[in-house]
Swiss-Prot record:
Residues 1-111 are annotated as: Disordered. The modification Phosphothreonine is found at residues 102, 196, 246. This is Protein sarah. GO terms for cellular component: cytoplasm; cytosol; mitochondrial matrix; nucleus. It comes from the Eukaryota. Signal peptide: none annotated. Pfam families: Calcipressin. Changing residue 67 to A: No effect on function in completion of female meiosis. Disruption phenotype: Flies exhibit spontaneous ovulation in virgins, female sterility with impaired meiotic progression (eggs are arrested at anaphase of meiosis I, they fail to fully polyadenylate and translate bicoid mRNA and the male pronucleus fails to mature), and compromised postmating responses with lower ovulation level, higher remating rate, and shorter period for restoration of receptivity. PANTHER family: CALCIPRESSIN, PROTEIN SARAH.
Length: 292
């Protein structure tokens, strides 16, 4: 064998075989370097994009005035002011602030819209006359707060209990409602109506309802029209009856009955002379009917 053939055989022996493990590792490394996207990751990306689009739609609806299923934490809940409650409720906590595993701490500031006083009704009259029963009822309500004050309303058979915070008032309202006291009466507890402070304490002028009666008004309101005057009312029957009365004569208006006297009108005489002393006509007394 020549030297050239030996060199070719050595080169072929030194070349790596594709079936060997080394060649397989190099092929896997080449495949790993190729940027391919798994099918599962593609689906996850699509779902994440869908959630972001839905969140964007919800934000657009909230800014455009559309209907939202869930209230935003930045929005304020308005309460009916006619019930004595404040116009705005404190903002809702954000989603990440409250942990579902741990119970949130109760803050007294979140109950500012609740009244701090309760009204106790259906109190037995014996309680107002007995100081011991009064003290027993006061101690019953002091179990919720030691700083409670009491106002006894004997005429109404009621008691007003004032607390320093709304939580104590709410606990007393819930636990002592329909409570049997002294085995004689069942008391009832209600929240007292809170007093809402007003910014303007001055009286407001009345509504200009009487401007329609002025013809024409100083400054006619919207929709004002002149009112037509009604025709004068003339009672011709009354004028004819007065004309039939002759001066100096008596006229019977109502005849006499068994239990009532007659009604007679005596007309006055006209003065024939000039101004001076005039003689008054005598007043004839009406005769009473005879009684059996």
């Amino acid at each position: 064998m020549s030297d050239a053939a030996k060199s070719n055989n050595n080169a072929s022996a030194d070349a790596p075989d594709p079936t060997t493990p080394d060649a397989t590792g190099e092929a896997d490394a080449a495949n790993a370097a190729t940027p391919t996207t798994p099918r599962g990751n593609h689906n996850n990306n699509n779902s994440a994009n869908g959630r972001s689009k839905n969140k964007l739609k919800s934000t657009q609806n909230s800014s455009g005035g559309g209907s939202i299923d869930k209230l935003s934490p930045d929005q304020d809940i308005f309460i009916n002011a006619a019930d004595g409650l404040p116009n705005q409720h404190p903002s809702l906590p954000k989603e990440g602030d409250v942990d579902s595993d741990t119970e949130p701490e109760v803050d007294a500031d979140s109950f500012d819209d609740l009244p701090t006083s309760i009204i106790v009704t259906n109190i037995h009259s014996e309680v107002f006359a007995n100081p011991e029963l009064k003290h027993a009822m006061e101690e019953l309500f002091r179990t919720f707060s030691e700083s409670a004050t009491f106002q006894w309303l004997r005429s109404f058979r009621r008691l007003r209990v004032n607390y320093d915070n709304a939580i104590a008032a709410a606990n007393a309202r819930i636990k002592l409602h329909q409570y049997e006291f002294n085995k004689k009466t069942v008391i009832t507890c209600y929240f007292a109506q809170p007093v809402t402070p007003v910014s303007n304490k001055n009286l407001q002028p009345p509504a200009p309802v009487k401007q329609f009666l002025i013809s024409p008004p100083a400054s006619p309101p919207a929709g004002w029209e002149p009112r037509e005057e009604g025709e004068p009312l003339v009672n011709h029957d009354l004028l004819a009856a007065l004309a039939s009365l002759t001066p100096g004569e008596s006229h019977e208006l109502h005849p006499q009955s068994e239990d009532q006297p007659a009604i007679i009108v005596h007309t006055a005489m006209l003065a024939e002379t000039g101004p001076g002393l005039q003689v008054k006509a005598p007043i004839v007394q009406t005769k009473c009917p005879e009684r059996a």
